[in-house]
Amino acid sequence: MNFFKNILFFPISQIFRFFTSLRNFLYDSGILKPKIYKSKIISVGNLIMGGSGKTPTVEYISRYYIKKKIFFSIVSRGYKRKSRGFIIASEKDNPKSIGDEPTQYLNKFSNYSKVMVSENRNYALEYCDNNDINYVIMDDAFQNHSFNKDVDILISSYNRPFFNDHIFPMGMLREPRKNAKRADILIYSNCPYDMGTEERRNFVTKSQKYSDKKAPILFTK
C-alpha cells in the first residue's frame, strides 16, 4: 500500500519542493530582499505542517521578557480565525476573530505586550517600528523570508523529528530537511522525561546532517 502511495505522491511532492526551493533561492540569491526593521525579531517556527510545540516556546520567551520588564509584541498569522487582515488584539477578541493561540497569548500577556495577527507580518512589524515596540516574537515564521530575523528558532517534535520526515504529501514537511540549516537554535519538543544521553546524542547526530553544526540543540518536555 505504501509503495503505491509513494508512487502517487512523489511527483506532487517534487512540485511542492520546486516551488519552496524557488522561493528560497530568490531570497538567498538577493533577487528578493527582506525588509529591515528596527525591532529585535525572534522567529519561532517549524518545518512541518501542523503543530510541533511552538506555543510553549513563545510563552517561555514572553515570560523572559516580562521578567526583564521589556514590553514586546507577539505576531501570529491567526490560524483558523474567521477574520482577515491586520488586527491588534483587544479584550473583545476571541478565537474566532484572532485564532486559538493568539487568544491564549492575549489572556496571559496582554498587560505586557501587544498581540497582533496578520497574514502579512510586515504590517505588524511596521506598526511596531512606528510605535517603539522594540522586541517582537514572530509565531510560525520559519518559512517567511520577507523580513529580517535576529534569531530563527526551529521547533521539531520528538514524536516526528524532521530528519525522518518527507516533503508533503509524502510526509508533512513544508520544505526540504536541509533548510534546517537556517535555524539559529533547534528545539525538540514533547521529549519523554526518561530520554537518555545516548538517545539525545543520536538526535543530535541525525539533526546535524541538515542543521548548522554551530546551532545549539535543546530538548524540552
Task: Indicate where each model-derived feature is located.
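A transmembrane-helix-recognition feature enriched in membrane-embedded lipid enzymes
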Residues: M1-K40
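Walker A (P-loop) phosphate-binding motif
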Residues: N24-E91, Y193
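Residues at the starts of beta-strands that form the adenosine-phosphate
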Residues: I70-F72, V151, D184-I185, P216
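Phosphate/Mg2+-binding loops and adjacent switch elements
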Residues: Y79-F109, S113-S211
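Beta-strand-loop-alpha "switch" segments that mediate conformational coupling across diverse proteins
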Residues: I217-K221
